[in-house]
């Protein structure tokens, strides 16, 4: 974690990334929360907590550790790197050892699945419940009324006068 100004601690690096707008206040506080509830988590775990918070706020379901491993964190505009993410194997091992992290099925603030994806528990739970509901629907053999389906499609996508293929109708 060297910068042009010399060595900085991981906590200082997170603070600088917050000050420069890379992390939000929520990301920083969540990372600090994980550090506090674990009695001082490894800096790599605290970094992962801040990143999973950031990625979730940006609309992602999880943080893919493999895609972030070795990445340099900073803002492109300032040209400074404040932190480099650890290698995948080391990062995964440190995260898995943290008491704040559980495997799928556990109730912990963070969930690490078998594909190196780190989730906030709530989002892992949402994804799991949604997947189960979709699988259950696919497995039901309920008959559907094809005439009703055809009428609905005709109402939403009337036949084109030019004889062209209506790709929206086909997609629906």
Where is each model-derived feature located?
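Helicase P-loop NTPase motor core of nucleic-acid translocases
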Residues: 1-172
């Amino acid at each position: 974690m060297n910068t042009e100004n010399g060595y900085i601690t991981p906590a200082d690096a997170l603070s600088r990334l917050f000050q420069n707008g890379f992390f939000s206040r929520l990301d920083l506080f969540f990372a600090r929360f994980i550090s506090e509830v674990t009695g001082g988590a490894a800096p790599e775990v605290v970094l992962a907590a801040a990143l999973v918070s950031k990625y979730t706020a940006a609309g992602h379901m999880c943080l893919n550790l493999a895609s972030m491993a070795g990445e340099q964190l900073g803002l492109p505009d300032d040209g400074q790197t404040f932190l480099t993410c650890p290698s995948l194997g080391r990062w995964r091992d440190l995260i898995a050892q943290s008491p704040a992290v559980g495997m799928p099925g556990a109730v912990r603030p963070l969930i690490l699945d078998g594909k190196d994806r780190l989730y906030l528990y709530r989002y892992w739970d949402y994804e799991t419940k949604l997947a189960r509901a979709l699988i259950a629907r696919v497995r039901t053999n309920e008959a559907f009324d094809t005439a009703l389906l055809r009428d609905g499609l005709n109402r939403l996508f009337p036949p084109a006068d030019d004889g062209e293929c209506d790709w929206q109708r086909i997609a629906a």
